[in-house]
């Protein structure tokens, strides 16, 4: 029976190694930044930088209007950079609200490296505070897509924006991990990014858009978010739309334009 013990020991070792690898490389699995050269010139918009608490410079592309009534802050997904955000939000640049596209650390022309959930949230708050110096909160809309819905919902929970729009949101990164790696303990994750909890704590209206054909983040996660505050959360199903299609569907732009009226 010694062979049974050897097999069990080998499986246990493989399990420990799997957990160790996932812990060490989770940033690589979660974040897929596309960096841009320091001299890269965006084809549209006005570029500037904000400084994080530790002095790291974070890149912003803005579309400002002389008589803007408020501001829209867009937080993108786990891939790309502000360069991709330009076409994902193209229909919003002519609204009578300023539009701000924000790159996380290591994305686009932003400096630094993402190392913790608290850091992600704090950087997003720095950007929100920048807008709050120019506009009352009742005229600030936060919008997020995919990965960015975790930060957008956090800003909604910690502040009092006019509205929060979430395209293709996840219930949490922990829930996403459990879809495929349920055997790995939750404490391994440094980035739980609990959107459900954030939306439950928020006081502003929330609109969720989610493709019913999304085979990456299940539509059921949008229903979970709706369930935590059914009177305050609006869920807009997008029939036949997949994960990437949620941010490109005309319903996203229509929704944001509706909530700023």
Model-inferred region functions:
Residues 3, 7-51:
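An N-terminal hydrophobic leader/cap segment in hydrolases
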Residues 57-130, 134:
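Membrane-embedded segments
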Residues 241-251:
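Catalytic histidine-centered segment of alpha/beta-hydrolase-like enzymes
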Residues 136-146:
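Alpha/beta-hydrolase fold nucleophile elbow
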Residues 213-217, 243-244:
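Acidic catalytic loop of the alpha/beta-hydrolase fold
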Residues 88, 195, 204, 218-227:
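Short alpha-helix in the alpha/beta-hydrolase fold that links the catalytic acid
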Residues 165-175, 195:
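Active-site nucleophile loop of the alpha/beta-hydrolase fold
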Residues 202-203, 208-210, 214:
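Short beta-strand/loop motif that positions the catalytic acidic residue
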């Amino acid at each position: 029976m010694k062979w049974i013990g050897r097999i069990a020991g080998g499986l246990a070792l493989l399990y420990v190694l799997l957990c160790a690898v996932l812990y060490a490389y989770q940033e690589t699995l979660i974040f897929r930044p596309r960096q841009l050269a320091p001299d890269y010139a965006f084809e549209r918009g006005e570029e500037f930088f904000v400084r994080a608490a530790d002095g790291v410079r974070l890149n912003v592309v803005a579309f400002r209007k002389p008589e803007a009534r408020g501001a829209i802050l867009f937080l993108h997904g786990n891939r790309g950079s502000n360069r991709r955000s330009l076409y994902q939000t193209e229909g919003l640049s002519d609204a009578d609200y300023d539009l701000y596209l924000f790159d996380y650390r290591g994305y686009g022309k932003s400096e630094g490296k993402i190392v913790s959930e608290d850091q992600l949230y704090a950087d997003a708050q720095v950007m929100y505070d920048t807008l709050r110096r120019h506009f009352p909160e009742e005229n600030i809309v936060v919008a997020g897509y995919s990965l960015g819905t975790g930060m957008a919902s956090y800003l909604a929970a910690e502040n009092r924006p006019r509205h929060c729009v979430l395209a293709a949101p996840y219930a949490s990164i922990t829930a996403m991990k459990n879809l495929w790696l349920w055997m790995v303990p939750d404490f391994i994750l440094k980035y739980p990014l609990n959107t459900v909890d954030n939306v439950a704590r928020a006081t502003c209206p929330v609109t969720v858009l989610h493709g019913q054909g999304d085979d990456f983040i299940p539509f059921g996660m949008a229903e979970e978010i709706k369930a935590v505050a059914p009177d305050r959360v609006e869920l807009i199903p997008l029939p036949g739309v997949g994960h990437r299609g949620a941010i490109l569907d005309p319903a996203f732009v229509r929704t944001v334009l509706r909530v700023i009226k």
